[in-house]
Amino acid sequence: MTELDTLKSQLMSEIAAAADEPAIEAVRVSALGKKGSVSELLKTLGSMTPEERQTRGAAINQLKTEITDLIGERKNALKDAAIAARLKAETVDVSLPVRQSPTERGRIHPISQIVDEITAIFADMGFSIAEGPDIETDYYNFTALNFPEGHPAREMHDTFFFQPDEKGERKVLRTHTSPVQIRTMESQKPPIRIVIPGKTYRQDSDATHSPMFHQVEGLVIDKKAHVGNLRWVLEEFCKTFFEVDSVVMRFRPSFFPFTEPSFEVDIQCDRSGPIVKFGEGKDWMEILGCGMVHPNVLRAGGLDPDEYQGFAWGMGLDRIAMLKYGMPDLRDFFNADVRWMNHYGFRPLDMPTLFGGLSV
């Protein structure tokens, strides 16, 4: 056996014996590093005759190539083995039932649950979610929504105003989520189908009102949108949201500056017990307001009302949560009472889906 064969056999044994990546790296350095055994052999080529260099050099280079390949293969094998061992050690059997803790920790707030339920319903209808700032300009909160300066309808909102800026203009805490309609029309070309959940602010506080409350509204803009489409959307929403097979609704004429015609929508229900039951009974419950988007609002959004039309609707999230889940006092939503949350809250893993059930 020649010197090269002996060295090759020795290195192959060391490579095979390397049990981890640091060990195989040590073998590489001892063989192919600057002072490695194979590198030292390559240094001897300079003192050889051309004839010796031709035969000896080819053999040494072949040894270097073989050892390099073997080290690479061993390194990859060790890396794969390390990954497999780590995966095995960190594997969680997801088929096992979750162990109940002595006390359940954390609950989803009913408002968060309601937002997830409503957005899941409208997402299935092809709507996207739109959001906007809580602090708005007078223009987006009032003027662009057909509340001109001095319009008596502005008195309907007890608004939180900020101090005037250097130009004398005052911003407001938005009194409704409708400013997002204008911002969306300015930035997006029709067709538009959006649902807008968010916080709103008015100076009011009692068992059914709060200075900060939540709204959700929807907007559809297209060339052929009409009241029939609006009615279908709202009926499908109510059936799915209240988890009933059918609903009876009535549309009463009303007034909103940003829609024409405008309607208040009532849904038939049974109010004889402590919890309102929808889809049955002979009572009526008002749940939302809606209407066809006013031409002035379309113009403010940069759209031609002779070409486009649309419809919109809006409702209070807090109130509709109270109706669906039988919560008597709106102020409890914001008291941070752990006992109330344990009673009315939802488990974190119970995400609402149309297939699994909205309020499981």
Curated annotation (Swiss-Prot):
Cofactor names: Mg(2+)
Comment on bound cofactor: Binds 2 magnesium ions per tetramer.
Recorded GO MF terms: ATP binding; magnesium ion binding; phenylalanine-tRNA ligase activity; tRNA binding
Subcellular locations according to the entry: Cytoplasm
GO biological process: phenylalanyl-tRNA aminoacylation
Recorded superkingdom: Bacteria
Any Gene Ontology CC annotation: cytoplasm
Keyword Transmembrane helix in annotation: no
EC number(s) stated in the UniProt entry for this protein: 6.1.1.20
Main location: cytoplasm
Catalytic activity: tRNA(Phe) + L-phenylalanine + ATP = L-phenylalanyl-tRNA(Phe) + AMP + diphosphate + H(+)
Record-listed Mg(2+) binding positions: E260
Alphabetical keyword list: Aminoacyl-tRNA synthetase, ATP-binding, Cytoplasm, Ligase, Magnesium, Metal-binding, Nucleotide-binding, Protein biosynthesis
HAMAP family for the chain: Phe_tRNA_synth_alpha1
Similarity remark: Belongs to the class-II aminoacyl-tRNA synthetase family. Phe-tRNA synthetase alpha subunit type 1 subfamily.
Subunit structure, as described in the record: Tetramer of two alpha and two beta subunits.
Name recorded for this polypeptide: Phenylalanine--tRNA ligase alpha subunit
